[in-house]
Amino acid sequence: MSDNSTTKVTTNDSPSLTTTTSTTTAPTTTTTTTTTPTHNHDTTIAPGVVKKVYTSGRPPWYDSKGNLKNPLVIGVCGGSASGKTTVCDKIIANLNVRWVVLLSMDSFYKNLSKDNDPSKYNFDHPNAFDYDLMVKTISELRAGKKVNIPKYCFKTHSRLVHQDTVYGADVIILEGILTLYSKELRDLMDIKIFIDTDDDVRLARRLKRDIAERGRTLESVLHQYNTFVKPSFDDYIIPLKKYADIIVPRGSDNIVAINLLTNHIRLKLKERGFDPEKTAQLDLEGLELPSSIHVIKETNQIKAMLSILRNKDTKVGDFVFYSDRLCSLIIEEALTYLPFTEKIVTTPTGSLYHGEELNSRICALVVLRAGGCMEQPLRSICKGIRTGKVLIQSDEMKKPHLFYEKLPNVTDSHVLVLDPTIATGASSEMAIRVLLDHGVPENKIIFVSVIASLKGILYLNYRFPDVQFVVSAIDKELSDEGFILPGCGFYSNRYFGTH
């Protein structure tokens, strides 16, 4: 598409979806700020149909060879209360992409000093935002790095102590009133969208939002709108239309335009080799087990313990006993893949013994909740080992979310990752990604599990070829619901006696 050209797509029941491109530069600014990812939303797809959309705590996207691919970055601009967030939610729901990060520009405000009256402060001026922080945040997310996102409170007009942690994504969406203002920020965007909504509609929405959600009075909202919001919209926001690739009239009410926009984003993703409809699929036919996947020798003793663990009638006490026994053997096997050096010692008889000693610091990462089942066997083998924990749980769509992480000092350490089952591999991938983001090289990670699905463990191997995997059994089947077959059921529930 040539510079400053415009293309319109019209439908019978909706205003046009306008596509434009331009190479004009924007004015530059400097400021300071904060940021927050949008949290989980219940998004209405159709009347009576609600889909929960998760937009935080996701690891970055890798191709089938384990290489990090740049995510698709989308900038959504528009006036205050134009429906930007609603449009983003509908796009996310329609895309059905596995991992999305949705960032709001509202979080990138400066702290307001006590001397400033919020009702007299222009929150719609470019100088109210920290574009340097926005550029840094988007750049690091594009590189697959972990970023800490501060939160901004509109009641106190300051940053909160708590920060959210974000781990990259397939798609990164930044929405706000002035997302297209900074040229440096625009250069990081693959798609630039402008939401064009009638002034009266935006004012009505702003009144409702600021009074109900931000503790403002009617008079203060109207004063701020007439004094700052409307003039800033005319002076700074409307001119940004010329930078947009796509203009969506009527905002979130324009369903046809949103559907066309979604299809356009799908095409952009497919151009990068990513098909949302074929996420994480592997061709397992003819594949040999890679050298980094180790299955402990299947002796009669191992088969007997696995039979007890797989048996649905096994009592809790027996399950715990044989789980601890089997995990001890698996962990012992995993320790053999650590680096050792020769050591000569003198025995009580005065003779010399040529032995080995561990040549590395080791620690462990317990993937809660099920990984806690392996912690006691680990401590019985590795005296005084330092352990960290991550809590990763899947939603009803079997997508993992990181809720908690606490790691010891992993510098120059080999790390044992403990999780008794590997099903789809999604939660395990996130656990490994946490370690990589803390500077642990792939070749210093050993993933220890009891039972893995063939698809799940191969999925992980292709993404992290230098990670070692040690298991006692690999089951070839995985149900449509993501359960290992034959498997052993919910491992943590059976170990802890919960339902």
From Swiss-Prot:
Pathway: Pyrimidine metabolism; CTP biosynthesis via salvage pathway; CTP from cytidine: step 1/3; Pyrimidine metabolism; UMP biosynthesis via salvage pathway; UMP from uridine: step 1/1. GO terms for biological process: CTP salvage; pyrimidine-containing compound salvage; UMP salvage. CDD domains: PRTases_typeI, UMPK. InterPro entries: P-loop_NTPase, PRibTrfase_dom, PRK/URK, PRTase-like, Uridine_kinase-like. Keywords: ATP-binding, Kinase, Nucleotide-binding, Transferase. Gene3D superfamilies: 3.40.50.2020, P-loop containing nucleotide triphosphate hydrolases. Residues 10-38 have a biased composition (Low complexity). One of its GO terms (molecular function) is cytidine kinase activity. ATP binds at residues 78-85. Catalyzes the conversion of uridine into uridine monophosphate and cytidine into cytidine monophosphate in the pyrimidine salvage pathway. Belongs to the uridine kinase family. This is Uridine-cytidine kinase A. It comes from Dictyostelium discoideum.
